[in-house]
Amino acid sequence: MRHRKSGRQLNRNSSHRQAMFRNMAGSLVRHEIIKTTLPKAKELRRVVEPLITLAKTDSVANRRLAFARTRDNEIVAKLFNELGPRFASRAGGYTRILKCGFRAGDNAPMAYIELVDRAESQAEVATAE
């Protein structure tokens, strides 16, 4: 029985899942918005939000913990130099999930996951108008 086992399996083994979410977390931190399937977005939120909370207090130990979870120094630098200070006054809820229809090939529900205080770039504003 699978009582009280949280998290989605997503038809992957544990190492594949861990690698996938490590890559997706890095992409989300780097680009601040990514498009993925809705179940992956909901699981990614459980990976990224603790990383941002960790980045709110800058210390060598926290940087090493973040590196152990992301395996990318560029991501760790952005977490602690930009995102940690940006979300210092926010107590959780750093990401937003926006549903965006269904994928053409297999009708999978798609979603954007983004950081809530993301700066709107000029290119996105121009395409919206």
From Swiss-Prot:
Name its species: Serratia proteamaculans (strain 568)
Q: Which PANTHER family match?
A: LARGE RIBOSOMAL SUBUNIT PROTEIN BL17M (PTHR14413:SF16), RIBOSOMAL PROTEIN L17 (PTHR14413)
Give TM regions. none
Q: What is this protein called?
A: Large ribosomal subunit protein bL17
Q: Which UniProt keywords apply?
A: Ribonucleoprotein, Ribosomal protein
Extract the InterPro entries matched here: Ribosomal_bL17, Ribosomal_bL17_CS, Ribosomal_bL17_sf
Similarity comment: Belongs to the bacterial ribosomal protein bL17 family.
- Enumerate the PROSITE patterns for this protein: RIBOSOMAL_L17
What does the subunit comment say? Answer: Part of the 50S ribosomal subunit. Contacts protein L32.
Q: Write out the GO cellular component annotations.
A: cytosolic large ribosomal subunit
Which one GO biological process term can you cite for this protein?
translation
Gene3D superfamilies, sorted: Ribosomal protein L17
What is an example of a GO molecular function annotated in this UniProt entry? structural constituent of ribosome
